[in-house]
Each structure stands twice: as C-alpha cells, then as structure tokens.
C-alpha cells in the first residue's frame, strides 16, 4: 500500500514537473518571439527613418546627426549617431546642468559682476546689466533661454572653463564631447576640426541624464527644464515639428558651415518624455543654415516613435 502511495505521488510530481517545464518552455519561447518581433519593429523603424533622413540631407544639401530616446520604452531613433558635429550653443543647456550639479540653489542668488570688455557678440541680456551685474541664476537663464554668449562664457568660467565642462561630462560617462574654446570662437565649426564637437548620441544621453536621470535632484532638474521651456530661439526648430499639445524644452545652436542644432526634451500627453538631439552642418563656410531641416527631422522622429 505504501509503495502504491509513493508511486502515485511520484507520478503526480512527474506530471507537475512536466507541466512546469512545458509552461517555462512555452513562456520562454513566447517571450523570445515577442522580443524578436520588437527588435524587428525597431530595426524596421530605423531603416525607414534612415531613408527619410537621407532624403532630407539631399533636399537641404546638409549632413544630419540624429539621436532620440523614448524614456518610457528605451526605443531609440538614430542617424549618424556617432559622427562629430560642432555643438555650438547647445552646450549652454548642459553647462547649466553642470553648474546646478556643482552648486547649491542658494548659490544661484549670488551677484556676478563683469565689465564691458567681457561682452562678446550676441549678448542681448548681459549687455543691459554691465553696471549692476546679474545673479548667477539670471546669467544661467540668459545663456539657456536667450543664448546670450557672454552669459555662456561666464557659465564656463564658473565650472572651470571649457575643460572643466568636458571633465564634468567625463565623470558622467561621456567619453566623446570635446570642449576647447569660449564664445564665440567655439562656433567656427570647421569640418574635420574636433574642437568643440560632440555627437548626437552623446549629447542626447547627457541631456537625458540632466533632465530625467540621476545627474541632478528633482528640484534642480525642474530649474533646468523651466529655463529650457522658455527658450526664445527654438520656435522654428524641434518645437515646430512636434504636435501642438506636446510640451517642449529645448536649446538651439548655430555656427559657420551651415551649422544648425537643437536638443530637446518633449513631453507627449500621458506618456514619458522623449529626448531628441538633431545636429546639422554643410560643406561651405558661408552656407546658410536651415531651420526647416531641423523641424522636418523632428517630424520624422516623432512619426517613428508615436
């Protein structure tokens, strides 16, 4: 009798084990199929966007670098993601992030004085306050919101210069960005010159770290994104390429050789934000940049991620 009970128990255990094995095998197989399907979908989307970005390059006679991250799904859209471009004034948003990283919010109330000799071309805010100075927070906001070049230089000085900026990014894992000069020389954008350059992928990752990652605490992230939401120079760029009910916070940049850039974090309704970096350049030094190129590239990104 005892042997019969043991036999029944053994049979039950065996059947249960077989069922679990079958379930695991089925579940594992299903997950593998699902993963392959998702990988295939992402690959298909990148192939489709690759063609569209290539067509934009031909249309505008320009070179594009694009990297976008859907922070909710980790889906990425990439085109020439590792090619170097002059970062131009996009650095101001990231340098402001470094400033916030290295200083308390109380430090933003400190008044910074400067002279007329410190002013450089395109300083619409700082040129009005030479006599009184500005708080560090006001200077950072002027750099990010109005792309004020003197404010950008003061930001650099407060974080150890261009090399201090580069060093801060290295600590965050960026092994790509090269920062060498102050405004306005950093906008020369000479083809083949790696000074003051980065890639769409590196910039997008840095922006993600500062705005939704762990590089800054919540309060400081909010300060940075509020400055970027008020950007006065981005209406015709990524902001123009996203649906009107999306919230956009961006920082633009421009330089010689038709350099036109925009980096942004955008919030679709009821979804996690999307990080977008779009960089562009042309072959001729005096070439005119195209805002429309950035707008249309942003539209390609949004259509692919929707």
Curated annotation (Swiss-Prot):
<dbReference type="GO" id="GO:0005576">
    <property type="term" value="C:extracellular region"/>
</dbReference>
<comment type="similarity">
    <text>Belongs to the class-A beta-lactamase family.</text>
</comment>
<dbReference type="GO" id="GO:0046677">
    <property type="term" value="P:response to antibiotic"/>
</dbReference>
<protein>
    <recommendedName>
        <fullName>Beta-lactamase 1</fullName>
        <ecNumber>3.5.2.6</ecNumber>
    </recommendedName>
</protein>
<comment type="function">
    <text>Acts preferentially on penicillins.</text>
</comment>
<feature type="binding site">
    <location>
        <begin position="251"/>
        <end position="253"/>
    </location>
    <ligand>
        <name>substrate</name>
    </ligand>
</feature>
<dbReference type="GO" id="GO:0008800">
    <property type="term" value="F:beta-lactamase activity"/>
</dbReference>
<dbReference type="InterPro" id="IPR000871">
    <property type="entry name" value="Beta-lactam_class-A"/>
</dbReference>
<dbReference type="InterPro" id="IPR045155">
    <property type="entry name" value="Beta-lactam_cat"/>
</dbReference>
<keyword id="KW-0046">Antibiotic resistance</keyword>
<feature type="signal peptide">
    <location>
        <begin position="1"/>
        <end position="43"/>
    </location>
</feature>
<dbReference type="Pfam" id="PF13354">
    <property type="entry name" value="Beta-lactamase2"/>
</dbReference>
<keyword id="KW-0732">Signal</keyword>
<dbReference type="InterPro" id="IPR023650">
    <property type="entry name" value="Beta-lactam_class-A_AS"/>
</dbReference>
<feature type="active site" description="Proton acceptor">
    <location>
        <position position="185"/>
    </location>
</feature>
<dbReference type="InterPro" id="IPR012338">
    <property type="entry name" value="Beta-lactam/transpept-like"/>
</dbReference>
<keyword id="KW-0378">Hydrolase</keyword>
<keyword id="KW-0964">Secreted</keyword>
<feature type="active site" description="Acyl-ester intermediate">
    <location>
        <position position="89"/>
    </location>
</feature>
<dbReference type="GO" id="GO:0030655">
    <property type="term" value="P:beta-lactam antibiotic catabolic process"/>
</dbReference>
